[in-house]
């Protein structure tokens, strides 16, 4: 399923994000830089030319968290217009293949459950995923 909120003529950026699940909680990170500093997101980043979404996600999690993930099924693709660009965000369910996570690029992190997802300020594109994630975590 795709969510669209699109305006033509903007720079287009394609990224991947890991919704890392551990039991009834997911891993969330707080941005430590840029226009969206202090907002929360799912870890991940830009895809490189010729790279699959899954390979990009494995690489990005290594770079951002010094961790290994097992990439599961696609949760959802979100299309979102930010003020300066159009974002295509491919979000995958993931699990950790390593125990330790090290924040190399983020300010903070937490493991919210379904009831806690609304307790932080999410980036707009990431926020679109919360209802689906909450329903899944409650099962």
Annotated model-derived regions:
Residues 93, 102-133:
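NUDIX/MutT-family hydrolases
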Residues 22-63, 67:
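Conserved Nudix-box catalytic region and its N-terminal flanking loop in Nudix hydrolases
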Residues 73-77:
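Conserved S-adenosyl-L-methionine
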Residues 68, 78-101, 110, 133:
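Active-site-adjacent beta-strand/loop module that shapes the phosphate/pyrophosphate-binding cleft
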Residues 2-26, 46:
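Conserved N-terminal beta-strand and adjoining loop/helix that marks the start
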Residues 8-10, 134-139:
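Generic C-terminal helix-cap and adjacent flexible tail
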Residues 23-25, 32, 95-100, 114-116, ...:
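Short loop segments at secondary-structure junctions
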């Amino acid at each position: 399923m795709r969510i669209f909120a699109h305006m033509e003529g903007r720079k287009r950026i394609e990224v991947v994000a890991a919704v890392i699940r551990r039991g009834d909680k997911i891993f969330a990170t707080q941005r430590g830089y840029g226009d969206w500093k202090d907002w929360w997101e799912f870890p991940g980043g830009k895809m490189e030319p010729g790279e699959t979404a899954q390979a990009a996600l494995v690489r990005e999690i290594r770079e951002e968290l010094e961790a290994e993930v097992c990439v599961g099924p696609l949760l959802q693709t979100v299309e979102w217009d930010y003020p300066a660009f159009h974002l295509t965000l491919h979000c995958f369910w993931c699990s950790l293949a390593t125990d330790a996570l090290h924040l190399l690029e983020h300010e903070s992190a937490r493991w919210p459950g379904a009831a806690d997802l609304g307790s932080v300020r999410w980036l707009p594109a990431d926020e679109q995923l919360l209802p689906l994630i909450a329903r899944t975590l409650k099962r």
